[in-house]
From Swiss-Prot:
Tissue expression notes: Mainly expressed in gut.
Disulfides per UniProt: 84-96, 107-127
Name of the featured protein: Cystatin-1
Primary location class: secreted
Source species: Ornithodoros moubata (Soft tick)
Amino acid sequence: MIRSAVVLTVLVGVCLAQRGFVGGWSQVDPKIRPDLLELAHFAVASQTAGLEYYHTVLELTKASQQVVAGVNYKLTLKVAPSKCKVSETVYSKELCQPQLNAAPKDCEAQLYVVPWRNTKEVTSFECN
């Protein structure tokens, strides 16, 4: 009986560790979640301070999420300057292609999304 309880406790612990704890951060595979790439482009488009050209997303390398009253996302991405001038156009992932020989940067974006209110907000964006 005690042995069964111990085995059950260990199995529950393993399952919780794999799924992440409620309110905790859990890894998400960005390759199977195209909505995360859309969020990455949204985050990049909002970062215009001091830029002549928008940056554009080259690759979304890592993602995690935290379920709260909505969802927090941490996205790790590679960006590079695009061909689109901030002063002349609105950002478009289709039109704002990377400049030739542009040096990529590693960035982390954090976003807060409330799907039932149709709202999303960039809460943090930093590049190395």
